[in-house]
């Protein structure tokens, strides 16, 4: 048969070219290609020789075979599955997967869908962290154990990484070729089931995004999925399922949804017990049952934005890793190597009759052996509930360990602690303390904030200060106070400042400074709405839902939990009732400014009374204590005479303005004068403050 490429003239030209190249000194630097594939000079010479001894057709076949060899023996399509994924069933046989507890129902549903003749493609839908991937691993273990329908008892579950299908596909058609190889691999193996985690990524995956007609992964898979030629298990979240899969109705009907809900606290404890051995072996830390229960209980209470069992497992893992880092493991290999070296030294010492040296070496060997035995688990660290509390505190910033240890005593004494900081407002302090004790002791309904209060009274009597002290006492620092000045929320756009803008408006993607976002990041907070009477009526409408249901939906549709917050609103409205005003008089005044349904949502409406001079005596002591804290940084002590305190009270007393004028007098007459004295006497270590000629004077030592 005549061939225009492989004829005798071509063979002679090629042999002559090879002969010339073999005589060149630069052959080692040259590269040779056949059909675009690089071959070695030896293979090319062999092919040339074959071309001279055989027909043109045989020469062409030899060239093609060499190209295939150089391309690499990639083997069958089954090997391609191994290249792009993990065989979960094989890992289950090898005992590499964690046990799956409490998911029998979901595993059974998934197995039933897989055993169908057509459209046998389950998709696990659930929020992040509920254990969708673990269910697939549990199915792989069930296949190994034989606890599945006969139709899938021989299946191999291959976890496929979508990005590996796209890797290296810079040329048109390369991605489609990978998908075809994947499909052929599944068909040829006859027992492979593909698992795509985050399966919503298949929408548009591999498409060029242009009008050129390039197909994405989902478009290529649809025909094979509908005919049952391949079987796929998918996993995705509710939002991604709604926003991606459900929009493609042709793809949706090829999948069967398996809903995965968050496990209960009891089931999560059993899950932790099932995986405990793996964590103990990995970290060399003992994890008792009470620690596992604390992981679940504390993660539910203090990490509400995440779901079980993921958050409980994370707390357990972090705690064990922290304890393991504090007790570094002995390097077993190095220790055994050192023992072997010492054994040799001991034998040499005995041979040389150096018995004292041999005895010392034996003591060192025994010490290393004891150390090695201890590292094998006899003296491993044991986790405690307090360790779990410390982990929660590091994750959230909430002083959980402090509240855990002495919570009952702290609850009993909360009113005394607040009363020492908030002077002259015993009724307000007691009402707030009762609400907090009721919540922390577990005797409220649990579906509302810890407490919601309306503080009413004149300016400068401690309304804002009580909110600050609550944040410090309950949550450990004053940064837990979220303060909103309602004068900034009086316009019609106030709602967008609270919950963020909705879709279609500017700033939809940037809601970082809204109230809902602040509470999402710090769910344990005191929220202060200062001068609430100045707020837009729409703000008050939003607060109805917060105080009644304990949650609020932001502009992007996320439900924010307010159940661990304290809501405090302050107002100057109706403060003129005087010290002997009754509750009905307060309510009568409040109804002039607020709707009845708003007032009825509060746990308590608290009137703050005018401060008298006796109350200012305690307040001036607190203000002077703050001055002393500042002086401590300079190593200076301070004594203030009673006459000086009386003078400050007399100068700073104003019944209408409360304690703020007194704070201003202390700043001007005490802080400023101490500053002036310090600048003239930088070596001063002690100052005395007294009154002379109706003037405050500072003297130093």
Swiss-Prot record:
Q: Where is the composition biased (Polar residues)?
A: 47-57
Region annotated Disordered, chain positions:
47-79
Task: Tell me which family the UniProt entry assigns to this protein.
Answer: Belongs to the ClpA/ClpB family. ClpL subfamily.
The alphabetized list of GO BP terms reads: cellular response to heat
Instruction: State the protein's purpose.
Output: Required for the development of induced thermotolerance.
- Which GO molecular function terms does the record list? ATP binding; ATP hydrolysis activity
* Alphabetical list of Pfam families matching this protein: AAA, AAA_2, AAA_lid_9, ClpB_D2-small
- CDD domains (alphabetical): AAA (cd00009), RecA-like_ClpB_Hsp104-like (cd19499)
Q: Which GO terms describe its cellular component?
A: cytoplasm
Q: What are the start and end residues of every segment in region (II)?
A: 383-575
Protein name per UniProt: ATP-dependent Clp protease ATP-binding subunit ClpL
| Xref: Gene3D superfamilies | 1.10.8.60, P-loop containing nucleotide triphosphate hydrolases, UVR domain
Query: Where ATP is bound, by residue?
Result: 126-133, 457-464
Q: List compositional bias (Low complexity) regions by residue number.
A: 58-72
Q: Per the UniProt entry, what species is this protein from, by scientific name?
A: Staphylococcus aureus (strain USA300)
The alphabetized UniProt keywords are:
ATP-binding, Chaperone, Nucleotide-binding
Which SUPFAM superfamilies does the record cross-reference, listed alphabetically?
A: P-loop containing nucleoside triphosphate hydrolases
Is Chaperone one of the keywords UniProt gives this record? yes
Query: What InterPro entries does this protein's entry cite?
Result: AAA+_ATPase (IPR003593), ATPase_AAA_core (IPR003959), Clp_ATPase_C (IPR019489), ClpA/B (IPR001270), ClpA/ClpB_AAA_lid (IPR041546), ClpA_ClpB (IPR050130), P-loop_NTPase (IPR027417)
Query: Which residues does the UniProt record annotate as the domain UVR?
Result: 336-371
The segments labelled I in the record are 81-332
